[in-house]
């Protein structure tokens, strides 16, 4: 089995930066050693948002974004290597998720698209890359997401304690880790995505730091109820979603019935939407003893407080308490998935995604042996 140092690269639906994690991985352990977050330039963020929200673009524009993101990911990796004084030969492989710009796992031709050309990452780092993790699962009839529950189970599963792991990124997803049962997991709906989109449009701020703006507002109950009637929330698992569904246009359509709504009240309502939609799914699955939260939303004190209030009797805490940085969880997961691919081990869980079988995931982009010698 391949073992040694791996790097995970993750750019999620929140678009709050490229997370890069260095970890030592083998069949018995995943030990995080270093991490950094690399900024996404404004022009790239705008290009990604335009695609995700269905704005027209040419194939040339898509190709340019693909190349530019690949180069950006390479810059982030090289920055981490320089900080740790490591050479390409010290790294077995990079596991790169890419940037999801469209995710449509149902219909006549299910598909998902992550951009950020892995060839450019190899060329500019000299390190083998494993990428394109989701499309094999979709080819096998699965949702292609979420893939992280397998990692949650490997790191945070417990033989007797009923646990759930909640990742609040742009989209929120839940992993059900119940002793003696197959792992399950799915996307519950919007995490930070709508909150971030609203404050960006209203205040030109990338996110609501410490939920300060939302705390100034009051929940608009009729708006909350209207949003919660969206069919996605009542749909059965397996299910997954993304920015192509829960985007600013979705929010605007719901706001048409509330002209003149105070912007702070809308922000408070979006925070409540995230908390309530998650709590409903936790309770629908019978609850748990511990809800372990990771992702950028775990730093939102209002969402965390509301989760605790909506889920009495359940310990709500961040994964940091278990020794795993909530900010780095997903990047770490894709480093681990790269290790599994190189080891010839399956990376998906059919009980989570609905695929017909477990499978080795991803495509391998080998480095030139000269650069890794």
Swiss-Prot record:
Superkingdom as given in the UniProt entry: Bacteria
Cited SUPFAM superfamilies: Actin-like ATPase domain
Keyword flag ATP-binding: yes
Record InterPro entries: Anhydro_N_Ac-Mur_kinase, ATPase_NBD
Biochemical pathway: Amino-sugar metabolism; 1,6-anhydro-N-acetylmuramate degradation; Cell wall biogenesis; peptidoglycan recycling
Catalyzed reaction equations: 1,6-anhydro-N-acetyl-beta-muramate + ATP + H2O = N-acetyl-D-muramate 6-phosphate + ADP + H(+)
GO process terms (BP): 1,6-anhydro-N-acetyl-beta-muramic acid catabolic process; amino sugar metabolic process; peptidoglycan turnover
GO molecular function: ATP binding; kinase activity; phosphotransferase activity, alcohol group as acceptor
Keyword ATP-binding: yes
Enzyme class: transferase
Family designation: Belongs to the anhydro-N-acetylmuramic acid kinase family.
Cited function: Catalyzes the specific phosphorylation of 1,6-anhydro-N-acetylmuramic acid (anhMurNAc) with the simultaneous cleavage of the 1,6-anhydro ring, generating MurNAc-6-P. Is required for the utilization of anhMurNAc either imported from the medium or derived from its own cell wall murein, and thus plays a role in cell wall recycling.
Protein name per its UniProtKB record: Anhydro-N-acetylmuramic acid kinase
Species the sequence originates in: Salmonella newport (strain SL254)
